[in-house]
Amino acid sequence: RIDKMGVVLNYGQVPLIKSRYLQYINNEEHPYGENVIVAIMVYGGYNVEDSILFNEGSLKRGMFRTTYYNMYEAREESSSVRGAQRDTRFANIQKEGAIGIKPGYDYSHLDEHGLIRENTEMDDKKVVIGMGSVSIHNDGGQMRDMSVMPKKGQLGFVDKAFMTEGETGFRIGKVRIREERFPSIGDKFCSRCGQKGTCGLIIPEKDMPFTKDGIRPD
């Protein structure tokens, strides 16, 4: 199955100090946080109130990096309006010679079933699912473009694309996009006990404070 959306922490870790309750919620099997080195101090004024300063080097090494998944879906259907039959089906729009193709969009990454190929690098101008509508009465039997377009600003890679059949016998196409996201200023974080704060500044590693042993906070 493919969920509508999902966020996965890439490098989740179990807490160093545990309670007996953890054995009942399977926290060690599904870690939801990371163990970081924290310095409680004032540094530069960008961590007033609930702000947090982050080490740029730690972020580049993968700290709090997440993978965001979102899904696009389309269904074939057949309808009749005032005696006119209209069928909507999956198709490679360019090969079918459909009318109404949207200018500026890239249809070249669709396979023979009309789904974008897996591992294709995404942007908001690449068609996700190719669909065409055919009505003998209105368009003389010629296919009209009804493709599914990505949302504005869509980036990432095509993680999964597959087709199945619904209860009514019509096909269902689903495409999952994965996008790697990095912490940025304004993102919200919290401790394991729920104390929240936002990222106020990302500091280069060479400018971070350090202990006499050379340990720098994350």
Where are these regions (language model features)?
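Conduit-forming functional cores of very large proteins
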Residues: 1-218
